[in-house]
Regions:
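Acidic/polar loop patches that form or flank catalytic/metal-binding clefts of enzymes
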Residues: 4-6, 121-122
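P-loop potassium selectivity filter motif centered on the GYG triad
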Residues: 8-83, 151-205
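Helical transmembrane-bundle signal
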Residues: 48, 130-133, 137
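Non-catalytic terminal/interface segments that mediate subunit docking, oligomerization
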Residues: 58-85, 97, 101, 107, ...
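Short alpha-helix boundary/capping motifs
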Residues: 126, 138-139
Length: 254
């Protein structure tokens, strides 16, 4: 809703010029679609591993661009093609463990005890996504700051200076790690550096979490089924759903 209101409300800088924006912020958008449909699809395509676009995300309003990046950084709401449940599953394990500690009950999920080993793996998996993204951004920023001749040799990367240039690099690696594919196209990314580094980011961001998630499944599969008792933490309640949402919001968002 914030994304839609931003785009339909128009650009305040253009308002200051006295230019009417009856159709909203139309920069980078197709007239046949308009600002509302473009804003809606920018959210739909980034909340899943879709990546198709019907407008230029780099031209959207600041809050819209933030929401697009946040969707991919959380990488859990609706899940990606083929691995949709797996990231959500990781946060369920964390939520079960934290909930159990909070209420003094044994952390269990699907009749299997969730213990320290599962929690350690789930924590590593949850931290991998931001680590892979920020590692790529750190490398590109280091090269841009200390090896400008290398950047110039690739035709230059940033067509927008300062903080938005950083956002373009952050979006690029976020999109790759989330297996999305959309981009802030003010970034000159069709170079050897960007193609290789985002390729590796995609591979690591896709397969390393799967290794951890399958390891958790293997550990749980090897444990005996524990019948439900009065001390079992129920995972089919609204309360646990809210708890899982809180864990996703706090851990994935940060």
């Amino acid at each position: 809703s914030s994304d839609l209101s931003q785009e339909m409300g128009g650009n305040p800088r253009i308002d200051e010029m006295g230019i009417a924006q009856d159709n909203g912020a139309m920069e980078g958008k197709e007239v046949r679609l308009g600002s509302a449909a473009t804003a809606l699809w920018s959210i739909v395509t980034t909340v899943t591993s879709n990546g198709s676009v019907n407008g230029m995300h780099d031209s959207t309003m600041p809050l819209s661009g933030m929401m697009e990046m946040l969707n991919m950084q959380i990488n859990t709401w609706f899940g990606g093609v083929g691995v949709g449940f797996m990231n959500y599953y990781t946060f369920i394990i964390i939520a079960v463990f934290i909930s159990g500690l909070m209420v003094g009950r044994t952390p269990e999920f699907l009749g299997k005890k969730v213990e320290a080993r599962e929690m350690k793996i789930a924590t590593i998996v949850a931290l991998l996504h931001p680590l892979i993204i920020l590692g790529g951004v750190a490398l590109s920023c280091f090269l841009f700051a200390h090896y400008p001749e290398f950047v110039a040799g690739e035709g230059g990367w940033l067509n927008n200076p300062s903080f938005h240039g950083l956002s373009e690099q952050l979006y690029e690696y976020t999109s790759a790690a989330a297996n999305n594919g959309s981009g802030f196209e003010g970034l000159g990314d069709n170079t050897y550096f960007w193609n290789y580094t985002t390729g590796w980011t995609l591979i690591l961001g896709r397969f390393l979490p799967i290794v951890g998630q399958v390891a958790i499944a293997g550990l749980l599969a090897g444990k005996k089924y524990v019948p439900e008792s009065a001390g079992t933490l129920k995972t089919d309640t609204v309360t646990f759903g809210v708890m899982t949402f809180a864990v996703i919001f706090i851990v994935a968002r940060s």
